[in-house]
A protein has these predicted regions:
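Short, small-residue-enriched loops and turns at beta-alpha junctions
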Residues: 56-57, 309-313, 344-345, 371
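Active-site-proximal loop/turn and secondary-structure-junction residues that shape catalytic pockets
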Residues: 88, 257, 267, 306-308, ...
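Short glycine/acidic-rich loop motifs that flank beta-strands on beta-rich extracellular proteins
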Residues: 79, 90-93, 113-114, 134, ...
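Extracellular "leader-to-stem" segments immediately downstream of a signal peptide or signal-anchor
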Residues: 2-83, 88-101, 105-234, 241, ...
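Extracellular beta-rich repeat passengers
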Residues: 342, 362-382, 387-553
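Outer-membrane beta-barrel domain signature
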Residues: 217-219, 277-279, 311-314, 369, ...
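Right-handed parallel beta-helix
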Residues: 106-107, 144-152, 236-246, 259-271, ...
Length: 553
């Protein structure tokens, strides 16, 4: 009981300190790179209400035409504010135009129609690829000076779009889905919202466009082609300030190739079981502020992307000049994430003063061979994490592929398959120059995993002034230039630190603490130039036979 009170107290302290920080600190203070100030939105004094154009509250009458008329009239006047007052407002897709501020008042709720005929198939980019999907509930393309503001709620009716696995639901929740209609799989483990969705799912090897179905047949699997809820493409001067965005069909917020973007004071929610239920996916954007938001979602919370494979490399637009401060993340596959679709690169990012509570992975970096792209100059500090069920910091350059295995007996000398050698090409991803400072994690599973590639090591990763209290310790694989300075790691299971085929590893500033004797394992013929803590010696140090005798300094 005392431990529970301590954890609750820690969370409360973190939340309170975060609020104070947000109220008193310049958002640009402490940035490690040169960044132009984000150009903010400004609107004409014109104000209209959706009611002025025949809008009807109550949640049963579609207001699609009323929204369109109101926006068209405001555009002709030079722009302004479209007010959605208190009430339930059912509608089909809303298309924002330049100089429009969609203002959803406190007590107002925009609910998007579950009628799939309201959402025609359109050309989009999803998961980093050019493709075809249903039109988004809210969209803007090549617009300038647009906003969604207010304290209301915007609901994408995502439950009508998504398949759900029985194992992710309670018995009561499962029965509710089955009773709503749709189709249950033959094995009784999955609920599909429609036959169209089921056909698309069965004709696809991914959650993107069904690759086993011709383009001419896409209409027959339309329900499977779920849209992101808010699609902002090629826009400039964009503000999202205040609303709750929830229950999206796929990703919640997707700014793409957009500049001068501000996301603040938002609540972004999705059921934890929602497939592709990301919070915000920032893709090939520049000059961005994301601060004072709360995320509780079904997939990655704050995710950085820049296109996938050849499509992303041809686009050649990195996500850059981004400040992310004072955000709270509850459930999500990752709190802050880069990848895996990062083929255009990512650079110049500052992430600080964020709290992750129960997030699957805290700080997550993922890619794989074939992506290409360079991720560099990422600065992360003042991050607090609690109850993280996997890694608090995790780099995985084998995402969607086979990761190296470091368990005892699975890399026995003389009894292992030779490593395949890959050439370095434009398809080789690069992660380098990433800095962590003042990271705190407690009551979590694993502290740090740094998994690079044999042909392209993780390079220049620095962690300092940080402390971790986890079950498992630290793993470094195929890395070059890793430095830990004033890092305390208290762990309870296995090896404190494992280093495999890595070089220029400086752990002199690592303090290990365990109920057992803290141990470090050095493995791999390519391992060299390793500096260890002075107090690790004798039986606390294990060096494999294949590792050079002079690998440890």
């Amino acid at each position: 009981m005392k431990k529970s009170f301590k954890i609750i107290g820690l969370v409360a302290t973190i939340m309170l300190s975060g609020k104070l920080y947000a109220q008193n600190t310049d958002i640009y203070k402490g940035i490690e790179f040169k960044m132009p100030k984000v150009i903010e939105t400004s609107f004409a004094a014109n104000t209209v209400s959706i009611k002025d154009f025949g809008g009807v509250a109550g949640g049963s009458v579609k207001n699609t035409e009323a929204f369109k008329k109101a926006i068209d009239v405001l555009v002709k006047k030079g722009g302004g504010k479209l007010v959605v007052p208190r009430g339930l407002w059912l509608t089909g897709p809303i298309v924002l135009q330049s100089n429009i501020n969609l203002h959803v008042e406190d007590g107002a709720m925009i609910i998007f129609s579950t009628d799939k005929s309201d959402y025609p198939l359109v050309d989009v980019s999803f998961e980093g690829l050019n493709t075809i999907r249903c039109q988004s509930p809210i969209s803007a393309k090549n617009a300038k000076n647009i906003a969604i503001t207010g304290k209301g709620v915007i609901d994408g009716s995502g439950d009508a779009w998504r398949a759900v696995k029985k194992g992710k639901l309670s018995e009561t929740e499962w029965k509710k889905f089955v009773a709503s209609g749709g189709i249950v799989s033959k094995d009784g483990k999955t609920w599909y919202p429609s036959e169209s969705y089921k056909k698309g799912f069965e004709g696809s090897s991914s959650f993107n466009v069904p690759d086993k179905i011709n383009k001419s047949e896409l209409e027959s699997v339309k329900d499977f082609l779920r849209p992101v809820m808010v699609s902002i493409v090629g826009c400039d001067q964009v503000l999202l300030d205040g609303p709750t965005f929830q229950n999206s069909p796929a990703w919640n917020l997707h700014p793409l190739m957009t500049s001068n973007l501000i996301l603040r004071n938002l609540t972004v929610r999705n059921p934890w079981y929602s497939q592709n239920g990301d919070g915000v996916d920032l893709e090939s954007c520049k000059n961005v502020l994301i601060y004072d938001n709360t995320f509780d979602v079904g997939d990655d919370a704050i995710c950085i992307k820049s296109g996938k494979n050849e499509d992303g490399r041809k686009r050649g637009m990195p996500t850059e000049n981004v400040i992310i401060k004072n955000n709270m993340v509850y459930h999500g596959h990752g709190g802050f994430v880069i990848g895996s679709e990062m083929s255009g690169g990512a650079r110049n990012m500052h992430i600080s003063d964020c709290t992750f509570i129960g997030t699957d992975i805290g700080l997550r970096f993922k890619t794989t061979r074939g992506r290409g792209g360079v991720v560099e100059n990422i600065y992360i500090k003042n991050i607090d994490m609690i109850n993280i069920p996997t890694q608090t910091i995790g780099f995985n350059m084998f995402y969607e592929g086979a990761s190296p295995v470091l368990e005892d007996g699975q890399r026995e000398e003389g009894n292992k398959a030779p490593e395949k050698i890959f050439a370095v090409t434009e398809e080789t991803p690069v992660f380098r120059n990433i800095y962590f400072k003042n990271i705190t994690a407690t009551n979590s599973d694993e502290a740090i995993t740094l998994f690079g590639l044999a042909e392209m090591n993780l390079k220049n990763i620095v962690i300092e002034d940080s402390q971790f209290e986890t079950k498992k310790g630290l793993s470094i694989v195929d890395a070059d230039g890793i430095q830990l300075k004033n890092v305390k790691l208290k762990y309870s299971e296995g090896t404190g630190a494992t280093i495999y085929n890595s070089k220029n590893i400086d752990l002199q500033g690592l303090q290990l603490e365990s109920i057992h004797k803290p141990t470090i394992k050095i493995v791999g013929a390519k391992t060299s130039a390793v500096k260890l803590p002075k107090d690790v010696k004798g039986e606390q140090l294990s060096i494999s036979k294949e590792t050079a005798k002079n690998a440890v300094k």
